[in-house]
Amino acid sequence: MNKNKSNKLKGIVVALKANFLIVEIDHKNFKDYSFDEFNGKIRLLCIRRSKLNYQGLFIDVGDIVGVESIDYKNKRAVVSDVEPRQSFLKRPAVANVTLVSICISADEPLFDMEQTSRFLLTAECANIEPLIILTKIDLITKNDLILYINKFKSWGYDCIPVSIHNSQGIDSLIERLRKTKLTVLAGPSGVGKTSLINHLIPTVSLPTSSVSKKLKRGTHTTRHVELFAIGNGSLLADTPGFNRPEIVCEPSDFAFLFPEFRTQLSNSQCKFRNCLHRDEPGCVIDKDLERYPFYRENLEEMINSPLPYQAG
């Protein structure tokens, strides 16, 4: 059996399957003879050392781990340790995320401002850069597309419009995704996340489904998180769709999760340090901003929620 017991290698968890971890390792520069038959990367089916469970260390997709006792013939190994995370997205659970790309459909299903904002706030809460991917732009007019782009710009976000039917915007999206290490593709069901991955990485061929005509929203096809290589050492995570992300935040911090509010608060200060930007005198937040009613509604939910600092 071709097994390496003495050398520990680093790898990244690309999927969780039952009680196993799928770990990808890169050994192209390793000089040991046992690697001669391999080129580039290989995925190993791994179990974890029991000490990790005793220590209360959870392992999720995206975690950087140490693997040992590698059986190259059967592609199996043991995960012995996990490195500290640089970031963590709670839902979907992915570690070391550098970009959250939120897929929003221009049509079918219809755009939902509250839903979109909740996904953006999920990234903001985790202090991870968000990017909006506007899908299905072949279903709308050029004027409507301009309105979408201007809307997201007023919120403080970049937007890459794409269509898998005519490949519009695909090259720009690939270029952007290859500039970051690990991108999570998130968004509600039915917006075309899985179809987009199939278009970006044709060798993947993930199952897809159409939008329900009765419910007017998508159905879930992705059941678990998995990482896929998109070139230049970058990884892309497909995630299960869900339609109402929860917001967990201190009420006093909530306004700082909105880029358009942050801009105003950085230019001038409210009269009172504990201003929640409701009806306090001397508040500098423009109450006519598009997302201000959404902010107020969810702020009240946070304040009145029986659970600590949660809206949703």
Curated annotation (Swiss-Prot):
<dbReference type="Pfam" id="PF03193">
    <property type="entry name" value="RsgA_GTPase"/>
</dbReference>
<dbReference type="InterPro" id="IPR010914">
    <property type="entry name" value="RsgA_GTPase_dom"/>
</dbReference>
<comment type="similarity">
    <text>Belongs to the TRAFAC class YlqF/YawG GTPase family. RsgA subfamily.</text>
</comment>
<comment type="subunit">
    <text>Monomer. Associates with 30S ribosomal subunit, binds 16S rRNA.</text>
</comment>
<feature type="domain" description="CP-type G">
    <location>
        <begin position="86"/>
        <end position="245"/>
    </location>
</feature>
<dbReference type="InterPro" id="IPR027417">
    <property type="entry name" value="P-loop_NTPase"/>
</dbReference>
<dbReference type="GO" id="GO:0005737">
    <property type="term" value="C:cytoplasm"/>
</dbReference>
<keyword id="KW-0690">Ribosome biogenesis</keyword>
<keyword id="KW-0862">Zinc</keyword>
<keyword id="KW-0963">Cytoplasm</keyword>
<feature type="binding site">
    <location>
        <begin position="135"/>
        <end position="138"/>
    </location>
    <ligand>
        <name>GTP</name>
    </ligand>
</feature>
<feature type="binding site">
    <location>
        <begin position="187"/>
        <end position="195"/>
    </location>
    <ligand>
        <name>GTP</name>
    </ligand>
</feature>
<keyword id="KW-0547">Nucleotide-binding</keyword>
<feature type="binding site">
    <location>
        <position position="277"/>
    </location>
    <ligand>
        <name>Zn(2+)</name>
    </ligand>
</feature>
<keyword id="KW-0699">rRNA-binding</keyword>
<comment type="function">
    <text>One of several proteins that assist in the late maturation steps of the functional core of the 30S ribosomal subunit. Helps release RbfA from mature subunits. May play a role in the assembly of ribosomal proteins into the subunit. Circularly permuted GTPase that catalyzes slow GTP hydrolysis, GTPase activity is stimulated by the 30S ribosomal subunit.</text>
</comment>
<feature type="binding site">
    <location>
        <position position="270"/>
    </location>
    <ligand>
        <name>Zn(2+)</name>
    </ligand>
</feature>
<dbReference type="GO" id="GO:0005525">
    <property type="term" value="F:GTP binding"/>
</dbReference>
<keyword id="KW-0479">Metal-binding</keyword>
<protein>
    <recommendedName>
        <fullName>Small ribosomal subunit biogenesis GTPase RsgA</fullName>
        <ecNumber>3.6.1.-</ecNumber>
    </recommendedName>
</protein>
<dbReference type="InterPro" id="IPR030378">
    <property type="entry name" value="G_CP_dom"/>
</dbReference>
<feature type="binding site">
    <location>
        <position position="283"/>
    </location>
    <ligand>
        <name>Zn(2+)</name>
    </ligand>
</feature>
<keyword id="KW-0342">GTP-binding</keyword>
<dbReference type="GO" id="GO:0046872">
    <property type="term" value="F:metal ion binding"/>
</dbReference>
<keyword id="KW-0378">Hydrolase</keyword>
<dbReference type="GO" id="GO:0019843">
    <property type="term" value="F:rRNA binding"/>
</dbReference>
<keyword id="KW-0694">RNA-binding</keyword>
<dbReference type="GO" id="GO:0003924">
    <property type="term" value="F:GTPase activity"/>
</dbReference>
<dbReference type="GO" id="GO:0042274">
    <property type="term" value="P:ribosomal small subunit biogenesis"/>
</dbReference>
<feature type="binding site">
    <location>
        <position position="275"/>
    </location>
    <ligand>
        <name>Zn(2+)</name>
    </ligand>
</feature>
<dbReference type="InterPro" id="IPR004881">
    <property type="entry name" value="Ribosome_biogen_GTPase_RsgA"/>
</dbReference>
